[in-house]
Amino acid sequence: MKTRYSVLSVAMTAAFYTQYAQADLREQCLLGVPHFQGEEVTGDQIMMPIEIEADNAVINQPKDATYTGDVAIKQGNRSLFADEVRVEQNGEQERRAFLKGSYRYQDNLIQAHGRDAAMDLGSETAELQNTEFQLVGRQGRGTAESGSFNHNKRILKNATFTACLPNDNAWSIEGNEMIQHIDEEYAEIWHARFKVLGMPVFYSPYLQFPIGDRRRSGLLIPNFHRSSKDGFAYSQPFYWNIAPNMDATITPTYYSRRGWQISPEYRYLTKLGEGIVAGEYIGKDRLDEYRPDDNNRKRYLMHWRHNMSFLTGWRLYVDYTKVSDKRYFSDFDSEYGSSTDGYATQQFKLGYYQPNYNLSISGKKFQTFDELDVGPYRVLPQIDFNYYNDELVKGGDFKLFAQTARFENDSKLMPKAWRFHVEPTLNFPLANRYGSLNFETKLYATHYLQEKGSSKQADDMDKNVTRIIPQVKVDLQTVLEADKQLFKGFNQTFEPRVQYVYRPYKDQSNIGSGLNQSVSFGYDSALLQSDYFSLFNDRRYSGLDRISSANLITAGGTNRFFNEKTGVEVFNFSIGQTYYLSPSKIDDLSQNSTTKRSSSWALESNWKFHRKWNWHGAYQYDTRLNQTSLANTSLQYKPSQDKLVQLSYRFASKDYINQNLRSNTYGQDIKQVGAVVGWELTDRVAFMASHYHDIALKKPVESQLSVNYNTCCWSANVYVARKLTATPIGSPDTINDLYYDNKFGVNFELRFGTNYSSGVRKMLKKGMIPYTEQYGIN
């Protein structure tokens, strides 16, 4: 799992070169590695016959024999070549060969040469002197004053080891004694000196490192970075291989402006499931600008993710993340969350699943990072039941969904509630070669038991609320294929779709309180974001607390073009709109009602005009706001997995944001352009650069430049980054007051012949806005 060792702090200059090598890096590295010649023999090696060839032989039976001149001794997979060999025999079991002068030893795992050696022909043991060795079929070589080799262990005295190829001494490890464990694929070394270009840079009385693919405990290579906010940072990870099915990484980090942070991560795979438990902790954050209201300077993160299948049909899922404060992900880079998420999720779900029904109990809570007077509700417990039966009614498919949920809020102004919901659905699907027609009837039956908030300022509530809403839906789809080609070489299809939905109006303003409408309606409902595909959703709101009235027709269609020779889709274009025969509303407030007869126009398109090129575009025009509400487009050139260029643009109007989020702090449109380049220049040099700029604010959002230099036995990464960060406490917080964190880092990675990655994909994952692909045609 951890065969790569990351990041020594060094200053380096990346030297770019543009010529391309004849073979990729892995092939180049393996060209410098010896390979076993001939057919590998399996079985007990000491039972194999011994073959001795020489120019001359003096035999003194049955005690000894002396061979001279191009002597070759072969037994199974091992061979010895020397100028002079004396073989001594003591009975049938003990036979030893003594080599004088220069020799060469090889088997299917190692090659060695030197002066003077002894070999036990009755076992798999060899004693070598003044030897140089190289692993067979993988990177790894070294020297030793003396060594004892057997079938599962090599003991070397005054030895060196490196994974670099011959004539490359970029790094090496020296020690008084080294034991290489062959089956376990690791080496132990005592009084270890780590050298770079022959210069000692690190000492340890004891060290372990891999000589294969298996995981081993030990210190990983430290990493460095410097940030304008954190100052100088140094991390020293320690890897602990606890058992074959569990391991851990413990990383202490020192920030010159904050203090010490400890970050343990435990991974497991057991009969009780698989998952990860992690944490990050600073006992006292010394950063001057961090001034919490309660003067508590402890900063921490807790994370637990667990998946489990047990007995027959039972599943358990846990995803729990909690941080000490709202600024945590703005101040610290973490694998377990981001400031752009807006919240941390704490949830679990235990379910029992059968072919025609399932039952689950769950709980969920959100820790928001925005400054909100009233936060979202937590739900515990939530009990869900689903039942499916396609034989209950002839020609129909019956579904039943039922839920019981308890809602509570941290604010004393907010009510508490139990919600009981039943939702039977009956579908009558019809399909033939011309298309499909689906008739659906559904009933939403919900009852609430509400308790007024404990504060005197809390709104009065109806204690018992019952809401029953029937629904009818008709959905028609077909696929039409054009007889003639609009564009030569491309076949065309058109997929029209028409859907009618009817639900009567029910005033739902007495469900929940209006004080938390900045995050939700009722207890867990929010206005859904819309695109072409969401036009055909039954509902405008998520959750169950707001089910808007509906008397509407949604019409749309998708046009597709296919290459007539390969049948591969190269272009599609979708357009649709909803037409309201009567206003859709959830209460009597005008802002929660559709006043126009038609909804937003929604368009979406994808074009793969070359196997290396992709384009995606989406556009929405809001007829209620009489403006473009959302738009985005992206163009990507990707000739290979490690070479890509992507340009993007995103737009969201402030009115659309206010309508959905209701907490648009700056009251500003979002107009953001972005460019990302990830490119493997050669087998050794790769880089990634990205820049995102907000046109509306006329200021950058994030910029990154990262360069990777790769060799057979090490790689180095140098990066610089500048990104928006949280407003320092007490500082001005207006649209013109933006704050940035500037970061510089150098990473080293020792390679032991198991990884030849260019590093492009790893670099693309970094940043506040990571690289994504959103293309509908691959």
UniProtKB/Swiss-Prot annotation:
Q: What does this protein do?
A: Together with LptE, is involved in the assembly of lipopolysaccharide (LPS) at the surface of the outer membrane.
The cellular location(s) given in this protein's UniProt record come to: Cell outer membrane
Tell me the HAMAP family matching this sequence: LPS_assembly_LptD
Q: Which InterPro entries match?
A: LipoPS_assembly_LptD, LptD, LptD_C, OstA-like_N
According to its UniProt record, what is one Pfam family this protein matches? LptD
Q: What is its main location?
A: membrane
Give the UniProt entry's GO cellular component terms. cell outer membrane; transporter complex
Signal peptide, first to last residue: 1-23
Q: Which UniProt keywords apply?
A: Cell outer membrane, Membrane, Signal
Q: Name one GO biological process term.
A: lipopolysaccharide transport
Q: Say yes or no: keyword Membrane present.
A: yes
Q: Which family does it belong to?
A: Belongs to the LptD family.
- NCBIfam families named in the record: PRK03761.1
Q: How does it assemble?
A: Component of the lipopolysaccharide transport and assembly complex. Interacts with LptE and LptA.
Q: What is this protein called?
A: LPS-assembly protein LptD
Q: Which domain of life is it from?
A: Bacteria
Q: Does the keyword Transmembrane helix apply?
A: no
